[in-house]
From Swiss-Prot:
It is found in: Cell inner membrane. Converts heme B (protoheme IX) to heme O by substitution of the vinyl group on carbon 2 of heme B porphyrin ring with a hydroxyethyl farnesyl side group. GO terms for biological process: heme O biosynthetic process. Its main location: membrane. It is an enzyme of class 2 (transferase). The lineage of its organism: Bacteria, Pseudomonadati, Pseudomonadota, Gammaproteobacteria, Alteromonadales. Belongs to the UbiA prenyltransferase family. Protoheme IX farnesyltransferase subfamily. InterPro entries: Protohaem_IX_farnesylTrfase, UbiA_prenyltransferase, UbiA_prenylTrfase_CS, UbiA_sf. Carbon 2 of the heme B porphyrin ring is defined according to the Fischer nomenclature. One of its GO terms (cellular component) is plasma membrane. This is Protoheme IX farnesyltransferase 1.
Amino acid sequence: MAKPLSISSSDTQSQPLQWRAYYEMTKPKVVALMLLTVLVGMCLALPGAVPLQPLIFGLLGIGMMAGAAAAFNHLIDRRIDGLMARTYNRPLPKGRVSITKALTFSISLAVLGFVLLYTLVNELTAWLTFASLLGYAVVYTAYLKRATPQNIVVGGLAGAMPPLLGWTSVTGEFHGNALLLVIIIFAWTPPHFWALAIHRKAEYAKVDIPMLPVTHGTEFTKTCILLYTILLAIACLLPVLVGMCGPLYLVGSTLLSCGFIYKSWELKFDDKPGLAMQVFRFSIYHLMLLFIVLLVDHYLWV
């Protein structure tokens, strides 16, 4: 007599667990911060309200392609991810997602995002977002990351593009003010990642990734972080100098820059443990709050 069909608890849980693995591959927290800068780029491009179509489909399409870039990063880095304490639990090293499925997911997400931008936003934004995806997934992850200690500096341009993508989503054209926002994120990227690289120096050395602390030492990297935070503080003043922002942004960005410089100074000249991760975490709040202040100031200033 045939046994009645039954569904085990492991079977019922496998599907949601599978989707959580795909969701994790898109690096949702990173994409969320990136989409904040996209939104600010959209809002600063216009004096009034942002039209709903480019707002909704721009954020959706750019977010999908950013998630695809992150998934490609998981795919390309799966070997070294399995050897590093920070990343060994990711879906691919743990076998929660196969290589074939990860590749299919990444390509599908990228294609859907591109089609969405191309048809419902504009061609310029679609192609710029595609170029940013290639810059991060191919140029940075597949080549620069393993080739030079300046990987973050050179490859950081792809990660600095979101405000420009937001700007072009609602205007369909380049503008110098959008490039100022790109410069800010470009200057922010090295100290952000170098602080993490100091904390994870031994792991990067283990997998032969030539991060700056591995190739040039921790003290040299601390000096570079301090110098870049000063450069970032100068870059943050550029929107004020061109009349793009008002007094609220000037005060807010100055306070944030002083805080970042202080944390970097402390990292350089104090040997307390855990300072590198403090700088890394502060840098995330710095960028998030800076763009929120940009947004609030824009509507008050207008």
